[in-house]
Amino acid sequence: MKAVVSVLGEDQVGIIAKVSTLLAQKQINILDVSQTIMDGNLVMMMSVMIPENLDSYQLTNEFTELGKEIGVEINLRNAKIYDAMHNL
């Protein structure tokens, strides 16, 4: 499944590394990345390919927990749903 991972929060060392590490542990391929720092806040979007055998509900929970641990908001959305939300 193609999906979009968004990461928002105060910039700090290690955010990208920790998010990328979780993706690698789950064998999730990063297709594209865009990130910027705005007024000290990280705004990152990743297009990823999630293997079909992974449970997206469990994965969403893991990203939520990681976000809490590192002090950012991490959202995972199916790319089709993300596109529909932004093409109204």
Residue ranges and their predicted role:
Residues M1-L88:
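A conserved regulatory-domain signal marking ACT and ACT-like small-molecule sensing domains
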